Amino acid sequence: FVRDYMKWIGHSEFGLDYRIINPSNLLYPNEKEFNHWLEQWYLTYKSVLELSVKYEEFYLIGYESLCGNPKVWINVKDLLGINQETKYLFKETKKVIGQTFDNNLSDKCYRLYESLVSKSFGI
């Protein structure tokens, strides 16, 4: 059921039905390599950043902010007009990845991440 459900709602970004989100001009087309996933992250969130510039009513919400500052969740609820008391325990986990990776690509990702954070709502 889970696999069918994920197909029905269009999730193919990982798992058995994985399809590359950004297939053009890849430096790392092999999905078994860590750099492939890093590159896909970069290409996906680069598009997200471009959308946030293009559309005024586009809000980025940093998960780390949700985890580290309960006021962020209150601000999100206020923005959406949610008056109901809903409590979520957002928990940030930090995983040390013991993989080798392309340092230039990693640096590009980090700079993009910093740009996303600087445009995040609710900080």
Regions found by a protein language model. Name each.
Residues 2-123:
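PAPS-dependent sulfotransferases, especially Golgi type II membrane carbohydrate sulfotransferases
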